[in-house]
Amino acid sequence: MCIRDRLACARGGWGSARLLERSIPWKPGWLLGFSDITSLLWSRLKAGLAGGIHGPLLTTLGAEPAWSQERLRQLLFGETPPALKGEPRGGGQTTGPLIAANLTVASHLLGSDHVPELQGAILILEDVGEAPYRIDRMLTHWRLCGALQQLGGIGFGQFEGCDRNLDDLLTTTLEAVLDERTADLNIPVVKNLPVGHICGNAALPLSLIHI
């Protein structure tokens, strides 16, 4: 009998990357979480296992709207949820492995052995509480690593609180940073997806999707 993992994370925060210093015996099944859980989702995906779901935590699931809870149920039971709606910039359509992540956590995984294959992938990013200049710094790091240039498509979820508490270091807006750092990639880009640190955090399967 094959014992399958069915892991739903209670909360995010910090520290999940420390677990990657150990050899995690991933098994088939599914893993649910987001934010700091990006580290575990990516490690599992790099190990060649499907079933990762970037979605609500146990501590936030009860506050999710009905459509979000139903979407998660559909994914857990092998049903196909409806397509998400965002704001496309430019045109085009692409198909590739779907990867979702918190931008800050994923940025600190670059260069490690826990980064899934990015070539041709569709990457969905979200974050919370990071000033636009920090978002710019991280996306520039991705570009310097050649990571953004490998993608087949990119989607931006919610960057909650990332345009608040503006200070003297702010010389641009979040919107301008996201546009400028992806403008020359010549791939489909979608913004304002209902994904991230919001009530209405749409679950995403780490699988195939069109944008």
Residue ranges with predicted function:
Residues 1-5, 209-211:
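Conserved small/polar residues in nucleotide/adenosyl-binding loops
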Residues 11-14, 130, 159-160, 195:
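Short glycine-rich anion-binding loops that position phosphate/pyrophosphate groups of nucleotides
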Residues 23-43, 51-57:
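Short, acidic/small-residue loops that bind anionic groups at enzyme active sites
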Residues 50-107, 111:
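Conserved anion/nucleotide-ligand pocket segment
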Residues 117-174:
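Internal helical hairpin/lid segments
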Residues 158, 162-208:
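ATP/nucleoside-binding phosphotransfer catalytic cores, i.e., glycine-rich phosphate-binding loops
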